Structure formats: C-alpha cells, structure tokens
Amino acid sequence: MKKIKNRFIKLFMAICLVFVSVFAFTQANAISVVFAKTNTDSEYVNTITDLKTTNLMGGVTLYEQKMTSLLNGDKQKAFQEHFVQWVDLASYSNANVKLVTWTKQSMDNWTAATTKVCALDWEKNHPGWIVIAGTNGDFFSNSGDNTKEPTNNFMADGDMYRADYVGGYRGVVGINGDNTVVVGDPKLSSNMMLYIYDKDGNVAEKLPISGYNTAATSDGITLYTKDCKDTYDLTGYTVCEGVYTICRVSNGKNKTVFVKGEMGLSRPGKTAEKPYQTREEIEEDGTSKTITVREFYIATKNQEVVNKLKSGVKVKCQYDFVGEWQNVENSVGYIHQMLQNGTSLNQCSTDSFIYTDHPRTFIGFKEDGTPVLMVIDGRGSSTNPVKKGNYGVSLFEGAEIMKLAGCVNAYNLDGGGSSTLIARNENGGFDVINRPSDYGYERSTGNAIFLVMRDPAVETVSGRSSASTISIKKKTTDYAKSVTDIKVTVNGKTYEMESDEVIATGLLENTVYDVNVEYKLNGELCKSSYKASTNMYDPGVDINPTSKGFNIGLRQSDENLITSKVTIRVE
C-alpha cells in the first residue's frame, strides 16, 4: 500500500510538472506574439493605417493615423488600437503662429463651452486674428460645486483669471509672449496688483493691493468684490466705485480673485459697505425690480490713488507672475508630465489615473520648442459605433506616441469625454477631427488651447487660378478693409496689391505653394501665411456641332500650354 501511495504521488507530481512546463511555454509564446517587433521606432507602438496629413493655415499640419500600443507598457498586457490625431508646425521659431489659451467670456461667473464655441469666442474677442487648430485644456470643476472653473492656474492674454495653483505633479505650462514656455510651479507676486490704464489702453501705473474682501488697511489699497461675504466699516476711507466687465473668484485654497472694469464715482465710505452684482430698485408704484450693477470697490485713504481712479479710467486687479514666469501671457494646468527630456515616464504604473486606458489630450514640445497638440480617442465599446475599436491609452503609451510625433517633453491635459481636437476648415468654420467619447458629441469644458495667427486679409480665388497661376484677392471683411500696403509673396516673387487682386505667375501645375502676406494695420507691420494650389491642367478638347460643321476648342488655355497641337481623327 505504501509503494502504491509513493507511486501515485510521483505520478501526480510529474503531471503537475508537465502542466506547469506547458503553461509556462504557452505563456512565453503568448508574450512573444504580443510583444513582437513593432513597425515604429517605439517597441510599444504600431501603426495600422498610413499617415494622413492635411496642410492647415500658417504652416500648421494636421496628422491622423490609427495605431496600437501596449497597455501601460506592460509586457503582460496586450496591444490595443485607437485613433490618434495631432497638429504641429514645420518651423515654430520663424512662424507667425502663436500658442494661446482661452475661456468663453462671461462677466459674472466661470463658464464652460465646447472647444469650437471657445474658438469662435476667441476670434470674436481678437478681431484680425484667426484660430487654426486647438484642443480642450485643463481639468475643470464639473461635479460637486460644479463651478466650471479650471482646477489649476489659468491666464489668458495676460489676465490672471485664476492665480491659485496646486503644485507638484499638477503643474502649469506658461506660454511667454515670444512663444517660449516655462513649466512647473508658477511664481506669483506676494500682493495683488492694481493696474491703471491710460486712454490708449497702455498700463500707466501698477500699485500693490494690501488686501481683498477683508478689513481695510489705513495705509494701503483694499479691493472688494461681489463675492464679499461680510459688510465692512469704511468710514474715514474714500470708496472708489467701479463696474466690472469680468469678475472671477477661485474656489482654490487661497480664494484668489480677478477683476477687470471701469471706475465710476468716488465718495466717502460708510459703516456697512459691500458691493453687489445685482440690487433691488424700488419703482414709483412701490414695486421692486432686480437690476444688474456689477459693482466692485477700491477703498483707500491715499488721495493720490483716488485722483488716479477718476471716472472712466479702466483698471485691472490681479496677481502677477514673477521671476522666470514674468513674461508669461497664457497658462494652462496639467496633471502629470508624461515625457521628460525624451524619456517616457510611468511605465507599468500602479496609479489607476496613469495606467487606465482613457481618451487623452496632450500638449508636448519638440527640441526647438515647437508645440504639439494631440488627442487619442478611447473608451471603446461594442455598442457605441463612435467608440468601437478605440480603447484609449495610459500616460506611458501617450508618451511613446508623443515621442514618435517629435516631442521631448509632454504633459497630460483633461481627457475622457473632454478630449477634443478641432481644425479650421476651408469655409472658415471648425471641424471636430477626433471622435469624442460622449457618443461623438463635444463636451463643454473650462478652457482651451489654440494655435492662432493673423488673418491674412486675402484669399485665393480658385475659379480664377490656373495650372500655372494663383489668383489672390483682398477679402471684403471690415478687418481687410482696414489694412493697407498689402504684399504677397509666392514662390520667391513678391507682388504688391495695388488693386484688390494679384495673380502669381510662372508656377508648376497642381502644386501647393506658401502664400506669405505682409500688410500694415494702423502703421504696424503684420505678417501671415497660408497655402494655395495651382490647378491640374486639362489637355482635352471640346467638339461642339454647329449648322456649318464643328467648333473645336481647348478646355483650358494657359501661358504655359502643355498641349500645343491637337490631332483629330474622324472615322
């Protein structure tokens, strides 16, 4: 009996050993299949489709391609597929293109809008400029208080909408006026600053603000906004009343504020002071109605300051960037850097935010500072045709793909249903290029980031162009009417637009050319560019019967005729 038991145990162990060996062999082979050699410079990324490129305005190029990538860069995982789309520039340092941020304008509160609506709003507030392409921006408050405010520091056009920042892995991309960037934790002034503007809109003076929505200081300047929770005794102070055009209060730890507006009357302070957004007004019949007043107060005992805040003077109250951040004009927050000096971070991460395959929006920069805006679709579903075959990526996969796009540094913007990439179309509107995971519909987000350029003020007349010429005419918009001294350069030859049209000649058939434009606006030299193409030459003939025979005509005549002889054979 004992021998039988021993034999059984040996047999059982042998079977187990065979099973383990077979399992290990099959697993090793499975991994070798999954992790086979890729067709890109990354061992974690494959391309499925050919790269589709579209030339946009200003030298910006749109790229679209379907790819697969190894989930989380983990060899125990599988390659998953997704659509990838991004925009960049061939030469950023010499380009007339700028990188900017924006939020849909609202006087009183934070607001959300789709990336397309935000682009239109940016153009509305920047006449003479156009958006070429862009994506959604920072994460924003869309649950809980649902304020729609960005969750990190945010500046647009030099206006510090939200001075609060988080820090650490939740950093900020700051964009300087010369298109260079600074990244990390922003450096801010210790005090808010009161900007006082002259009649031409230039900053005449900047003064430190000692406090806001708090008890006034006898030797300083105190700001009060509509969000002030308490009333304050301002007897002995002069209260300079203002009407704001924008007022924002952050819900961050510092509750920072931003105010922009115009000063009104100045008066002695009272015992219980507080500005309001709306007030109740009593009618002659005794009824009341609500009127919008949009008040802010500046309280001070300094008469020199009061004299500078005369009625009609425009002002701004905000924190400033300082140090290496002092030239930043636009900023946007991110959560996690993914690519650092050419090295992809977070491989095989155990942080679910990092390793989960989501739709993602990224901003990255090449060695020369050229920006790349990318969206990768995700949240694949067999029941949702928009998302089918789109799984999304971890941050490591995104870093590998951004590296393939030429980036050396990259950062993760808001993703999921927010991920949206838009591009300007030929009709002056915007197309959504990617496949948003909310069943193809754009989500409204807190802010956006765009590549923008000067409006060229001219356009191509395709019907008047030929196989060797491009017809360019001045636009009929109000902006175009305000510009002078237009010069157009095509293929190295410059044409002065003395009338409303010039024709670039001596060009090659069916060829794309850069159209470089210079003009003056109020004495300032402005530059812009776009691409235009010559037509395909049609060497055919048309034969039209008449009562006396046939009329034979060339379908297309040109200064450089390809067809010089026509032979007709009639059987």
Give names to the regions the model predicted.
Residues 477-488, 559-567:
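Solvent-exposed loop/turn segments flanking beta-strands in beta-repeat/beta-sandwich domains
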Residues 7-29:
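Sec-dependent N-terminal signal peptides of Gram-positive bacterial secreted proteins and lipoproteins
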Residues 493-499:
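Short beta-strand segments within Ig-like beta-sandwich modules, predominantly Fibronectin type-III
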Residues 142-167, 171, 175, 331, ...:
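Conserved, well-ordered active-site substructure
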Residues 457-478, 530-550:
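Pro/Thr/Ser/Gly-rich low-complexity, intrinsically disordered linker/stalk tracts
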Residues 31-292:
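Zymogen propeptides
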